[in-house]
């Protein structure tokens, strides 16, 4: 679909569904552009979203800032014009700001640790270079698997009983070492230090099989691996072709019978000689997702095998074992029966989180409470602490993609979805729904431009212009991405989190990390006058509730990686609180329009077509 306005002419996707939808069968999934630099392969061997394909294309064939004139016509871009698409192409598009040329850019220097990354008095060019590490210090592809893994650190120090939540971030290449000291790379998770691996199951959306195999220790690379995916037709054939060289890999296709659904769950089941571990996380199984993004991980304890003749069911107070078994059963897939049996043979009683899953289908009656936002609602009604009388505890949602939510907030966001997030134990009269603030965190154009990856980071933030134009009302809820607490302000989030903080943001009533973005496809939407919940996708997350830890509320940890005298029950929120509302010139990142007014941290522009 070609569009032309004062911004120039470009091609945009015709899809208005912002979930990470795989390309249609007749579209190629690989790029054949010549390699522009180290760290990026010449072509994508795995199937991915259109936004990610564009990001890959721009990484290997970048449009430099001084090349922009050859890409777009010489026309001044209006910063506040309601005509055309009505979108500013940069979040720093002040007409009074002098044009930036390559000659004006000072020599690049290492970024300094700052509380506020950018200052309004600094020119665009200076802001870009201040945050861009020298090319010589950027990890190269040949080494980065080692550099970003935690090899050499004492992993057991990280997994000690002093961390009751077992909630981690992935390691990020290009930030200070102290911010990676208690973070995990996939190689750490698969390390022999965690157990002697017998077999594993990898549930995910996007797979680079060759890369994945290299993340396993050499001694485990020939052990059985089950890949659970949602690919169809040519995408499925591509995945099978990737897996064909590996005799130990088998595949299981998740059924997706409702249009626009995806298999978005990200989970590892790891069977060891010593027991079983469950890992629920937010990263695709591709290099880019474990390199310079903010991602979340929950690690289960090592679950021991139940002794024969023992009368224990191995169930936890959170019913995690039953819920995980129910989730796997919902696939109705024979290859998963073996894993259901394995789970039944292990003792999961030490689990202190609740499982929140989504599975495709239409659910009525009591079945409606099993999945999606109604599952969250049911758990909060049963276990969430009631807020003190007279206090209005806000809701925070943070995500990397946004679906079509309707023409106004009443259609889904501030009706059924907010009702679920507001649920508490039935004690006292809660504040009116409209009085509860809703803070939504989604990266701005400026967040993406000044990120470690630069504009290509936006390939993992697939909010389209078609969807955005239909729901401008939503953007008044948006807050910037800022994560000084974890050193990840410049590592764009692919993590998804939802929580209920106190009015001063010092306490939490609950915290959820999940694969579910802000969409009806992920969370479900009511049909048939509210009697039926329809869900399109598979999703999975874990809910932290204070009652499961013997607490009334969680205290918010002041610094994510601090090991100071803060109480062990302080919860490590991975981004800054309170979140900062978009300013008048901030715009949400939209992947399929160009950004040519200012270069990113690599000196490049974003021209998606």
From Swiss-Prot:
GO annotations of cellular component type: nucleus
Keyword Zinc carried by entry: no
Residues of the site described as Interaction with DNA: 519
Record note on disruption phenotype: Mice display an inability to rapidly repair single-strand DNA breaks due to covalent bonds between TOP1 and DNA. They are hypersensitive to camptothecin, topotecan and bleomycin.
Protein's cellular compartments: Nucleus; Cytoplasm
Regions of compositional bias (Basic and acidic residues) in chain numbering: 105-118
Residues that bind substrate: 266, 496
Coiled coil: none
Expression (tissue specificity): Ubiquitous.
EC nos: 3.1.4.-
GO biological process: DNA repair; single strand break repair
InterPro entries assigned: Tdp1
Compositionally skewed regions (Polar residues) per UniProt: 1-12
Chain positions with Phosphoserine modification: 61, 119, 132, 149
Domain of life: Eukaryota
Chief location bin: nucleus
Keyword Phosphoprotein: yes
GO molecular function: 3'-tyrosyl-DNA phosphodiesterase activity; exonuclease activity
Active site (catalytic residues): 264 (nucleophile), 494 (proton donor/acceptor)
Disordered: region residues: 1-155
Region spans: Interaction with DNA: 401-404
Residues that bear Phosphothreonine: 148
Subunit text: Monomer.
The protein's role, per its UniProt record: DNA repair enzyme that can remove a variety of covalent adducts from DNA through hydrolysis of a 3'-phosphodiester bond, giving rise to DNA with a free 3' phosphate. Catalyzes the hydrolysis of dead-end complexes between DNA and the topoisomerase I active site tyrosine residue. Hydrolyzes 3'-phosphoglycolates on protruding 3' ends on DNA double-strand breaks due to DNA damage by radiation and free radicals. Acts on blunt-ended double-strand DNA breaks and on single-stranded DNA.
Similarity comment text for this entry: Belongs to the tyrosyl-DNA phosphodiesterase family.
Protein name: Tyrosyl-DNA phosphodiesterase 1
Organism: Mus musculus
GN (gene name): Tdp1
């Amino acid at each position: 679909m070609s569009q032309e306005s004062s911004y120039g002419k470009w091609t945009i996707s015709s899809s208005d569904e912002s979930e990470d939808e795989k390309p249609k069968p007749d579209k190629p999934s690989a790029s054949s552009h010549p390699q522009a630099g180290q760290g990026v392969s010449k072509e994508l061997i795995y199937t991915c979203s259109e936004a990610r394909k564009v990001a890959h294309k721009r990484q290997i064939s970048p449009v430099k800032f001084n090349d922009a004139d050859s890409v777009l016509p010489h026309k001044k871009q209006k910063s506040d014009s309601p005509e055309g698409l009505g979108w500013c192409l940069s979040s720093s598009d002040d007409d009074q700001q002098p044009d930036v040329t390559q000659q004006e850019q000072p020599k690049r220097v290492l970024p300094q640790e700052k509380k506020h990354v950018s200052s309004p008095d600094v020119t665009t060019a200076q802001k870009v270079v201040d945050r861009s590490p020298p090319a010589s210090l950027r990890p190269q592809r040949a080494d980065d698997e080692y550099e970003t893994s935690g090899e050499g650190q004492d992993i057991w120090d990280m997994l000690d009983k002093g961390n009751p939540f077992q909630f981690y971030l992935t390691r990020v290449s290009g930030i200070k070492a102290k911010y990676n000291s208690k973070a995990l790379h996939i190689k750490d998770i698969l390390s022999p230090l965690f157990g002697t691996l017998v077999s594993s199951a990898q549930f995910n959306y996007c797979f680079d099989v060759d890369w994945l195999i290299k993340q396993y220790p050499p001694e485990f690379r020939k052990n059985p691996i089950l890949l659970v995916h949602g690919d169809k037709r040519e995408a499925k054939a591509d995945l099978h072709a990737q897996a064909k060289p590996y005799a130990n890999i088998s595949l299981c296709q998740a059924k997706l019978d409702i249009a626009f659904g995806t298999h978005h769950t990200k989970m590892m089941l790891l069977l060891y000689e010593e027991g079983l571990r469950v890992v629920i996380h937010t990263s695709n199984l591709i290099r880019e997702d474990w390199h310079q993004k903010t991602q979340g991980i929950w690690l289960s304890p090592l679950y021991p095998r139940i002794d024969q003749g023992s009368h224990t069911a191995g169930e936890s107070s959170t019913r995690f074992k039953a819920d995980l078994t129910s989730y796997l059963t919902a696939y109705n897939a024979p290859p998963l029966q073996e894993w259901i049996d394995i789970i039944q043979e292990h003792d999961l009683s030490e689990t202190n989180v609740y499982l929140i899953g989504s599975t495709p289908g239409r659910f009525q009656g009591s079945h409606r409470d099993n999945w999606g936002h109604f599952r969250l609602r049911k758990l909060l009604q049963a276990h969430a602490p009631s807020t003190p009388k007279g206090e209005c505890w806000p809701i925070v949602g943070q995500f990397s993609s946004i679906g079509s939510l309707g023409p106004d907030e009443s259609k889904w966001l501030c009706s059924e979805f907010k009702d679920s997030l507001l649920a508490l134990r039935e004690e006292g009269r809660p504040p009116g729904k409209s009085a509860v603030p809703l803070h939504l965190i989604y990266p701005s154009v400026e967040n993406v431009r000044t990120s470690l990856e630069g504009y290509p980071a936006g390939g993992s933030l697939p909010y389209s212009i078609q969807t955005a134009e239909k729901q401008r009302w939503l953007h008044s809820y948006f807050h910037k991405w800022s994560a000084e607490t974890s050193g990840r302000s410049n590592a764009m989030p692919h993590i998804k989190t939802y929580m209920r903080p106190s009015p001063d943001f010092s306490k939490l009533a609950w915290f959820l990390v999940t694969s579910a973005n802000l969409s009806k496809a992920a969370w479900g939407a009511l049909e048939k006058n509210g009697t039926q919940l329809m869900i399109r996708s598979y999703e999975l997350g874990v809910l932290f509730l204070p009652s499961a830890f013997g607490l009334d509320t969680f205290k918010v940890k002041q610094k994510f990686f601090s090991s100071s005298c803060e109480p062990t029950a302080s919860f490590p929120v991975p981004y800054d609180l309170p979140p900062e509302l978009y300013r008048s010139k901030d715009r949400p990142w939209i992947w399929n329009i160009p950004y040519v007014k200012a270069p990113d941290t690599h000196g490049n522009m974003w021209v998606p077509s």
